[in-house]
UniProtKB/Swiss-Prot annotation:
Disruption phenotype: Slight elongation of leaf petioles. Increased length of primary roots in seedlings. This is Profilin-3. One of its GO terms (biological process) is defense response. The keyword Cytoplasm applies. Binds to actin monomers and regulates the organization of the actin cytoskeleton. Can increase the critical concentration (Cc) of actin assembly in vitro. Acts as a downstream effector of the hydrogen sulfide signaling to regulate the assembly and depolymerization of F-actin. At high concentrations, profilin prevents the polymerization of actin, whereas it enhances it at low concentrations. Binding to the poly-proline motif of formin induces oligomerization of PRF3. It is found in: Cytoplasm, Cytoskeleton. Belongs to the profilin family. The keyword Cytoplasm applies. Plants overexpressing PRF3 exhibit a dwarf phenotype with delayed seed germination, reduced lengths of roots and hypocotyls, and inhibition of hypocotyl cell elongation due to F-actin rearrangement. Residues 24-36 have a biased composition (Basic residues). The gene is PRF3. Residues 14-36 are annotated as: Disordered. InterPro entries: PFN, PFN_euk, PFN_sf.
Length: 168
């Protein structure tokens, strides 16, 4: 099982060298099963903080279900242990955050319809948050206008589903 801060991805590549100069022997090289390590930070930078129709998330992170930070954008709020516990409780017993709200770094979000045991969504002014639970992690996306809730949901939930399919 990979460590929480690294994920190995096996990639097959084919590299061919070609020159117009006459050669005595073929210089074709084939590389098989090149192993590439993809860090959790790469997932945040390239897959969560990506461009979606000209818009980007305001902040994003991947945290372990214990609240440990695996990777985050520069402006992701400092999440408190009791805030993580509230999120975990809502995944276990959906609806527990609705009366009090969802807190991230002291910011309160009104909980809106999510998917029981899979996704929590919150709204705050012109923005909001989507949290996707995976086998080992919590994937967070925070947005403000002009990004739409649907765009945030798509980015966060697609990465979350990919991680679930990868056993993460």
């Amino acid at each position: 099982m990979p460590l929480p801060h690294t994920h190995s991805l096996v990639v097959s590549t084919l590299s061919l060298e070609h020159s117009d100069k006459p050669q005595r022997r073929s210089r074709a090289k084939v590389k098989k099963k090149k192993k590439t390590n993809m860090s959790w930070q790469t997932y945040v930078d390239d897959h969560l903080m990506c461009d979606v129709a000209g818009n980007r998330l305001t902040a994003a992170a991947i945290l372990g279900q214990d609240g440990s930070v695996w990777a985050q954008s520069n402006n992701f709020p400092q999440v408190k242990p009791e805030e993580i516990q509230g999120i975990k409780d809502d995944f276990t017993t959906p609806g527990t955050l609705a009366p009090t709200g969802l807190f991230l770094g002291g910011n309160k979000y009104m909980v809106i319809q999510g998917e029981p045991n899979a996704v929590i969504r919150g709204k705050k002014g012109a923005g909001g948050v989507t949290i996707k639970k995976t086998t080992l992690a919590l994937v967070f996306g925070i947005y403000d206008e002009p990004m739409t809730p649907g765009q945030c949901n798509m980015v966060v939930e697609n990465l979350g589903e990919y991680l679930i399919e990868s056993g993460l």
